[in-house]
Curated annotation (Swiss-Prot):
Catalytic activity: N(6)-[(R)-lipoyl]-L-lysyl-[glycine-cleavage complex H protein] + glycine + H(+) = N(6)-[(R)-S(8)-aminomethyldihydrolipoyl]-L-lysyl-[glycine-cleavage complex H protein] + CO2
Disulfide pairings: none
Self-association and partners: The glycine cleavage system is composed of four proteins: P, T, L and H. In this organism, the P 'protein' is a heterodimer of two subunits.
E.C. number(s) listed in UniProt: 1.4.4.2
Pfam families in the record: GDC-P
Keywords: Oxidoreductase
Lineage: Bacteria, Pseudomonadati, Pseudomonadota, Gammaproteobacteria, Legionellales
CDD domains named in the record: GDC-P
Protein family (similarity comment): Belongs to the GcvP family. N-terminal subunit subfamily.
Function: The glycine cleavage system catalyzes the degradation of glycine. The P protein binds the alpha-amino group of glycine through its pyridoxal phosphate cofactor; CO(2) is released and the remaining methylamine moiety is then transferred to the lipoamide cofactor of the H protein.
Listed name of the protein: Probable glycine dehydrogenase (decarboxylating) subunit 1
Length: 456
C-alpha cells in the first residue's frame, strides 16, 4: 500500500540514532504488568485487497438490531441524495472560511437553512446553528437572562420534563453565572408539567421559563397556557422542541397569546444519522427584536455595488469578533456540515414530505403502544397525549427485560429510572417512520414471551 511512512530501514536507522535495540525499548519504563500482550498477535501488514476482505469479515459480526430507542436521538430514513450532495468537495470542508464572503455557495446554503428553521418554528430570525440541542438550550437560557431587563433575581424555571441531559448541561453552564435554576415537578399521572406548581410563582420575579414540546417522555405539554403565563408574568419563554413534530404541531411562534420568545432544539432528526452521540447540531431562532442577543453566526442577504445579490455574515458586533466580555456567547462556530445535510434533507422532503414523516412516526408509536399494552404486566405509564415516543411500565425489572430483548436483536427502549427514581421499571419506547408492522409485531411477540416467562 502507498503512503506507509517508515520502511524497516527507516525504523532501524532511527532506533540506532537514539541507542535503542527495538521499538519495545521505547516503552520500557512501563511495568510489564501494565502492558497489553495482545498486540504481539497482530499480523504483519497486508495488501489493500486482503485488508478490505478482513474489514468485510469483521463488519459481518455487527448486530443490526431493531431499534426502538428515542430519548433525544432518533432513527429516521435519510434519502441517499442527502449525504451524496453534502459530501461534495464544495461543501465538505474542515471549517468555516475565515474570509466567509469568499464562499458564497456555503453562505447561501446557511441562509436557506435559517429561512427553513424560521418557517418551521414560526419565528423571525435564526442563527446558523449551535453545537447540539443541549448547548443550544443552555445558550437560550443565557440569552433569556440578558433579554429580561425587568428581572432582578435571575431565576429560571425549567420543566422537570425537559431532557435530563439538557438540564444537566444548563446547570453546568450557568453554575457560576449567578443564575438560579428551579425545576418544576410534573404530574405523575399525566406525564406533563404540573400547572399548579407553575402558578405558585405568579407575580414573582422569574427571568425565564423553559418548556419542552414534546417533553422527554414524549408527552405533549400544555404549551399555550404555559406560554401565556410567561407573557403575563413578564418572563422570557424558551421552547425546546423536536423539529420533526413541527410538521404536525403548532409552531412555538403561535403558542399562547403572543408566542414564545426563543425556540431551540436538537437538529439530529433532520438528516443526521445516529452516531454514538454525534456530531449533531443545535438550532436557535427568536424574534427580530431579540436578534442582537442571539448567540452564534447569522447570515444575511444583501446587494453589492453592482446590484448583484450576495450573502455575508451580519450583525457581527454581537459575536466573537468583538471583545470576549462583550460577545453574546463563547460559541463562535457552527456545525456547518450537519446543517448542510439538514438543509438538503428539508429541501428534498419539502413540507409535505416532513408531514408524512411526522404522521408515520405518530401512527407507528401509537400502534406500538397499543400492541405492548395488550401484554399482561405492561401498561402505559402516563395519560397525556404523545407524539412519537411514550413511557410504558413493566411489572418486572426493566434491565433484565432490556437484556433479553437485546439477546433477541431488539433495542427495546431507554430506562429513565436513573434520572427519575420514581419511574422504576419503566421504559421509554419510540417507533419512527422506519419501523415496520413486522418490527412492531416482533417486539410485541418477544416482550410477551419474556413477561410470561416470569409469570410461569
Amino acid at each position: 500500500m502507498p503512503y506507509i511512512p517508515h520502511t524497516p530501514n527507516d525504523t532501524k536507522e532511527m532506533l540506532a540514532a537514539i541507542g535503542a535495540q527495538d521499538i519495545q525499548d521505547l516503552f520500557d519504563e512501563i511495568p510489564a504488568s501494565l502492558q497489553y500482550a495482545g498486540f504481539q498477535n497482530i499480523p504483519a501488514g497486508i495488501n489493500e485487497m486482503e485488508m478490505l476482505k478482513e474489514a468485510q469479515n469483521q463488519a459481518q459480526k455487527n448486530r443490526n438490531g431493531i431499534c426502538f430507542i428515542g430519548a433525544g436521538c432518533y432513527e429516521h430514513h435519510i434519502p441517499a441524495a442527502v449525504w451524496d450532495i453534502a459530501s461534495r468537495g464544495e461543501f465538505l470542508t474542515a471549517y468555516t472560511p475565515y474570509q466567509a464572503e469568499a464562499s458564497q455557495g456555503t453562505l447561501q446554503l446557511l441562509y436557506e437553512y435559517q429561512t427553513m428553521i424560521c418557517e418551521l418554528t414560526g419565528m423571525e430570525v435564526s442563527n446558523a446553528s449551535m453545537y447540539d440541542g443541549a448547548t443550544a438550550l443552555a445558550e437560550a437560557v443565557l440569552m433569556a437572562v440578558r433579554l429580561n431587563k425587568h428581572s432582578k433575581t435571575n431565576r429560571v424555571l425549567i420543566a422537570g420534563t425537559v431532557h435530563p441531559f439538557y438540564r444537566e448541561t444548563i446547570e453546568t453552564i450557568v453554575r457560576n453565572q449567578h443564575i438560579e435554576v428551579i425545576t418544576l415537578p410534573f404530574d405523575e399521572q399525566q406525564g406533563i408539567t404540573d400547572l399548579g406548581s407553575l402558578n405558585q410563582y405568579t407575580g414573582e420575579d422569574i427571568t425565564a421559563l423553559v418548556i419542552a414540546q414534546p417533553n422527554f417522555f414524549g408527552c405533549l405539554e400544555q404549551v399555550d397556557k404555559m406560554t401565556s403565563w410567561a407573557h403575563h408574568n413578564k418572563t422570557i419563554s424558551v421552547a425546546c422542541i423536536n423539529p420533526t413534530s413541527l410538521a404536525l404541531l403548532k409552531p412555538p411562534g403561535s403558542w399562547g397569546e403572543h408566542g414564545v420568545d426563543i425556540v431551540c432544539g436538537e437538529g439530529q432528526p433532520l438528516g443526521s444519522p445516529m452516531a454514538s452521540g454525534g456530531p449533531y447540531f443545535g438550532f436557535l431562532s427568536t424574534r427580530m427584536a431579540h436578534v442582537r442577543q442571539m448567540p452564534g453566526r447569522i447570515i444575511g442577504r444583501t446587494v453589492d455595488k453592482d446590484g448583484k445579490t450576495g450573502f455575508s455574515l451580519t450583525l457581527q458586533a454581537r459575536e466573537q469578533h468583538i471583545r470576549r466580555a462583550k460577545a453574546t456567547s463563547n460559541i463562535c462556530t457552527n456545525q456547518g456540515l450537519l446543517v448542510t445535510a439538514a438543509t438538503i434533507y428539508m429541501s428534498l422532503l419539502g413540507p409535505e414530505g416532513l408531514s408524512q414523516v411526522a404522521t408515520q412516526c405518530h401512527q407507528n408509536t401509537h400502534e406500538l403502544i397499543t400492541a405492548l399494552t395488550q401484554i399482561e404486566g405492561v401498561e402505559q405509564a402516563f395519560k397525556a397525549s404523545f407524539f412519537h415516543e411514550a413511557l410504558i411500565k413493566l411489572n418486572q425489572p426493566v434491565q433484565s427485560v432490556l437484556q433479553q430483548l437485546a439477546d433477541a436483536g431488539i433495542a427495546g427502549g431507554y430506562a429513565p429510572e436513573q434520572h427519575y427514581p420514581q419511574l422504576a421499571n419503566t421504559l421509554l419506547v419510540c417507533a419512527t417512520e422506519v419501523r415496520t408492522a413486522e418490527d412492531i409485531a416482533k417486539y410485541a411477540k418477544t416482550l410477551k414471551a419474556i413477561m410470561s416467562k416470569r409469570g410461569a
